């Protein structure tokens, strides 16, 4: 009986976050993005996730630390599809430049032990400051850095599909 209870308990923990779907990314594109050649991605600070198992008197074994910088991830994605990043917005390039902003909007509980990280990305015309495109997306991975990476890629894919 104890063995059955233990198996049921393990199964409950293993499937606590399963079966819950992420919300589909919501994207709004108001203008042709490909009329722009340059992007200025507003700098963000890095996000770090750590995990580990304590191994006794000699410290942590099997630990892992991951760090991502959302603005660098967004910049890399945009470079890959043909945009050129610029370090600042200049007057001579303003009419061909998008200003891209990223924001972390929190978490959404998915199940007993799982949650999704939610983000928003906005793209504005550098000259007029009008909204050109935006998206809201969420991601759920092994840790917070994976969650944010998934959400960024999901949102950008929705904008550029």
How would you name each of these model-derived features?
Residues 24-25, 58, 67-146, 150:
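Surface-exposed short loop/turn segments
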Residues 17-81:
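A structural "domain/chain start" motif
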């Amino acid at each position: 009986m104890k063995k059955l209870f233990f198996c049921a308990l393990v199964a409950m923990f293993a499937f606590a976050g399963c079966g819950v779907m992420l919300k589909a990314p919501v994207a709004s594109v108001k203008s042709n993005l490909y009329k722009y050649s340059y992007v200025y991605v507003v700098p963000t600070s890095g996000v770090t996730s750590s995990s580990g198992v304590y191994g006794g008197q000699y410290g942590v074994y099997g630990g892992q630390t991951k760090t991502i910088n959302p603005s660098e991830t967004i910049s890399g994605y945009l470079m890959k599809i043909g945009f050129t990043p610029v370090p600042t917005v200049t007057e001579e390039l303003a009419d061909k430049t998008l200003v891209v902003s990223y924001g972390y909007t929190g978490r959404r509980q998915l199940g007993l032990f799982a949650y999704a990280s939610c983000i928003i990305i906005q793209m504005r015309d550098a000259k007029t400051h009008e909204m050109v495109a935006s998206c809201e997306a969420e991601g759920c991975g092994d840790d917070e850095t994976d969650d944010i990476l998934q959400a960024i890629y999901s949102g950008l894919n929705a904008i550029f599909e």
